[in-house]
């Protein structure tokens, strides 16, 4: 009996560490995909979302925070720094007005950014640590969970009001309109769980099971988004990487919620 409990605990710790790895490496992929995206825009004489001098500082801060988080050095502080860096860069890109996106694409982009910020706040609370030396900050974790709830509300909203998202689900998931409504209800229920703070572990477990097929069939269908909906290739790859980071957050909360 004791060996079964020990093996189960070991497995949960291993899965939790996997979630931490996916989340802490997310900024590396974000910086790489942004560099590739802005290189493509430079060839077409188009501007990046953030002016170039500030862009280098922004990416430097992201890589610095991601490096320390990955090595587990002052992870809580650098997770908080990563959340702040991402919030500032997103705000700067939004008010800069250098690139204009469609409303449906803004919802996809900014909702994922909000979820990643929430993931960093969850990490800054002390969740996902194998050997916790300090007590967990429940306020930071609750705030991160609220951000995840906001992301899920945006996904549910897109399923009802964005024809681009609806077609992505209709074309690549069986069940047609009924499946869309089931996903809408499921996203809404999960959002309520994260926003209220009740049944968070169960909601995170469901989300961790739900996200991989959605990432594979919806976000991973680059041909649909790039060729049909004219989303820039590396922008879609960045969104896909953020979905992986959100999955990592769900895994952390599912195993250490």
From Swiss-Prot:
Upper classification of the organism: Eukaryota, Metazoa, Chordata, Craniata, Vertebrata
Function summary: May activate NF-kappa-B signaling pathways.
Keyword Coiled coil set for record: no
GO biological process: positive regulation of canonical NF-kappaB signal transduction
Transmembrane segments: 21-40, 52-72, 77-97, 110-130, 139-159, 182-202, 206-226, 233-253
Subcellular location: Membrane
Cited Pfam families: TMEM101
Superkingdom, taxonomy of origin: Eukaryota
Species per Swiss-Prot/TrEMBL record: Pongo abelii
A GO cellular-component term linked to this record: membrane
Key words of the record: Membrane, Transmembrane, Transmembrane helix
Keyword set includes rRNA processing: no
Membrane topology (UniProt): Multi-pass membrane protein
This protein's name: Transmembrane protein 101
């Amino acid at each position: 009996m004791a060996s079964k409990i020990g093996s189960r605990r070991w497995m949960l710790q291993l899965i939790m560490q996997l979630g931490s790895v996916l989340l802490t490496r997310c900024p590396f992929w974000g910086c790489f995909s942004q560099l590739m995206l802005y290189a493509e825009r430079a060839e077409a004489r188009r501007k990046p979302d953030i002016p170039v001098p500030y862009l280098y500082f922004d990416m430097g801060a992201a890589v610095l925070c991601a490096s320390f988080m990955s090595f587990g050095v002052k992870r809580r502080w650098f997770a908080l720094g990563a959340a702040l860096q991402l919030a500032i860069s997103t705000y700067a890109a939004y008010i800069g007005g250098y690139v204009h996106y469609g409303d449906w694409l803004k919802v996809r982009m900014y909702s994922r950014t909000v979820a990643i910020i929430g993931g960093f706040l969850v990490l800054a609370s002390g969740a996902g640590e194998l050997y916790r030396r300090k007590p967990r900050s429940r306020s930071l974790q609750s705030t991160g969970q609220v951000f995840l709830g906001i992301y899920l509300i945006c996904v549910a909203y897109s399923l009802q009001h964005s024809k681009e998202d609806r077609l992505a689900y209709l074309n690549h998931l069986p069940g047609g309109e009924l499946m869309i409504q089931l996903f809408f209800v499921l996203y809404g229920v999960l959002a309520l769980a994260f926003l209220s703070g009740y049944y968070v572990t169960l909601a995170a477990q469901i989300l961790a099971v739900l996200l991989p097929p959605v990432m594979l069939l919806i976000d991973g269908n680059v041909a649909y988004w790039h060729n049909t909906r004219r989303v820039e290739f590396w922008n879609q790859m960045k969104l896909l990487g953020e979905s992986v980071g959100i999955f990592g957050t769900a895994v952390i909360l599912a195993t250490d919620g």
